[in-house]
Structures are given as C-alpha cells and as structure tokens.
C-alpha cells in the first residue's frame, strides 16, 4: 500500500496481467484493494462508496460528489467529476487515454486482462455487427418476438415470469449470436461465456472475488477463440460484450417505465416511443455508470494541474442528472426534448463502437414487451448485483402480464 502526497491510500498496480499472477498474490491484491475502498467509504468519501458497490441506489453518492464541485479528489487516488460540461470535455479530449504510459495500468486500475480485453483498448472504429438497419434489425426483431412468444404463447392469458432470465437475456444473447454469425451448435457456449463475463467492466475498478476474476479471464480467452473466424474478431468480441450493456439498459428501462405507469401506458399506445424510452433511460439510469480515463501528459482541468498518469473518473450516470443541463432531472419523462444530450455510451467510451447495436436491442425489446403485454407490472422484489459500480442493471425482475 502507498500513501502519496495527496493523501491517497492506494494499492500499487499488479504490473502483470491476471493470467500471469498466481492465485495467492492476486487474491491478496483483490482483498487489500477492497479493504482500502471500504476504509475510504467509511471515512465519508462518496466515490469510494460507489466503488464499494453495496448500495441498490448509487445516486445519493453521486450527488455528494456533485456537491464537492466540478472536480474533486478522492482518497482512492482518483479525480472525480459529476459535472456534465467538464465530463464532455474529458471524454472528447485526446489528452486522456484508457491506461497509463505504454499501456501500463495506473494504481486505481485494479487489474488488467491484457491486450485481449477490448475494454482496455482505445476504441476508434465501429465494431463488428454495429450496423442496426435493414437485415440486422429484422433479425433482432424476429428473435425477440420468437423468444417472447415461446415464453408466453397466448397473449390473452396471464403469465408470471422473470423478466431478465425469461425474456431479455435470452433474446439479446440469441440476437447477438445471429448477428455475429456464431454457429448454432456453439450458441449455448456463447451465452454461458457472456454470463461469466458480466462482471468484466466492474472488475477493472472494483475488486471482485478471485473466483469471479479467474472465470472472467478464462471466458475472455474462450470467447476470443470462439469469435476468431469473424471478419473482424476484435470488433466481434466488443460487440459480444455489448450484450451485457443491452440487457442492463433494457432492464433499467422497464423498471423506470413500470415505476411510472403513465409512461408505460404511453409507450403501449405509441410503440414508436421505444427509441425515446431508450434515450431517456440512458440519461436517467444508464447501463454504464462511469468512464475512467488516464491523463496522457500534464494538463489543467477545472483549474487544477494534473500530472501525467492521473486517474480521472467521469460519473456518466450523474451527468445525466445535472440540473445545469436537464430540467427536473430526477423525473423520468418520455417527452423530454433534450434527453439525447446525455453522455452515456459516449462515442469515445469503451462501448461507443457498439452503442447503436445496444440501443437497437433495447428498443426492440421494449417494443416487443409493450406490444404483447400492455398490462405488464412488477410482481416482486428486484435483485441487484453487488460490487458493480460500472455496469448497472437488475439481475432479476419478477413480472406479471396482467
């Protein structure tokens, strides 16, 4: 552990990829880093509270960050912002990258899976399959419709089912497999690998269990091999990882809509509002809650001089509720005229190249649900994951169709 001149108590980076580190060293690193996050959270640091990932609702912690000004320093060693204007300038600037010099993680980046992890690479070009028009849209719509009809064949009957496991995850995964050309006999493997990779984005900033990290590392290698025959295998890999974001986005959208019944009824009456529902969800409760950057060279930010290697975190979810930009930001509103001013799934972010496909999957899922089950309602408690400060979405949502 190190205590630098800024007062930050941090863990030194591993300096090697997950695969190159023995279980004992990796496990110790994960436990000690998580302990540091708990200490800082207990001492009142809101960003450490976010990293700890124990709250169902992280938005109160985001507001505590906002109250500290446009840019504040966390004792975890990161500079943090919830300010929309500042965040936009960071995300669009070439002064910031995804890792330190020569691709080496900085201390605030808990671990590295190496060059094979698309979330640790600069994203420049659209990923494979990220052209959501024409034939691909038809494929996605057909698979979503078939999945829901298989779950609930009689639209006039009453059904109780788990939204994510029963419909959203199978439909989104199957549609992605079809778009990416995964062989039919490997699609069950594809789905299993994506489930093991669900905590991948969280694990880069928030320590997971040793078993979870090992499972994700192995799944990343297996998925890379599975997609190796793609015309653009790196892009295909990123597109596959976008499945998690699409599932989370859909889950967040449905929860927001069902919590505002008049908005759900509006969507059922006007299915064309599905795209607006997706954009408002991206503002209100996005699937990727934050985006981390590393300063490439000494720079000034919000009146502060930041050295090369400084770690800067954009709380994307918080910027979507910035009262300086959005009127009544705590209200979910399908008619909001400026919802698309959010910074979620930013083109320069890790999921930027697959943002169109993520949006398409969520839009189609909402249209399909609203068209078949206008009486849909939540029928039980929502289950959410822990240690998930980056990816936000429910694990389980019991619903009833009547």
Swiss-Prot record:
Cross-referenced InterPro entries: Cyt_P450 (IPR001128), Cyt_P450_B (IPR002397), Cyt_P450_sf (IPR036396), P450-rel_GT_act (IPR030958)
This protein's UniProt keywords: Antibiotic biosynthesis
Top-level lineage group: Bacteria
Pathway: Antibiotic biosynthesis
Single Gene Ontology BP annotation: antibiotic biosynthetic process
Residue ranges the record marks as coiled coil: none
Keyword S-adenosyl-L-methionine: no
Disruption phenotype: Cells lacking this gene are not able to produce glycosylated macrolides.
SUPFAM superfamilies membership: Cytochrome P450
Sample GO molecular function, one term: oxidoreductase activity, acting on paired donors, with incorporation or reduction of molecular oxygen
Any one Pfam family match given in the protein's UniProt record, by short name: p450
Protein role: Involved in the biosynthesis of the macrolide antibiotics methymycin, neomethymycin, narbomycin, and pikromycin. DesVIII assists the folding of the DesVII polypeptide. However, unlike chaperones, it remains bound to DesVII during catalysis, forming a tight DesVII/DesVIII complex. Although the formation of the DesVII/DesVIII complex is essential for the catalytic activity, DesVIII is unlikely to be involved in catalysis directly.
Subunit structure of this chain's protein: Forms a complex with DesVII.
Family recorded in the similarity comment: Belongs to the cytochrome P450 family.
Note: EryCII, OleP1 and DnrQ are able to replace DesVIII, however the total amount of glycosylated compounds is significantly reduced.
Identification of the protein by name: Protein DesVIII
Gene behind the chain: desVIII
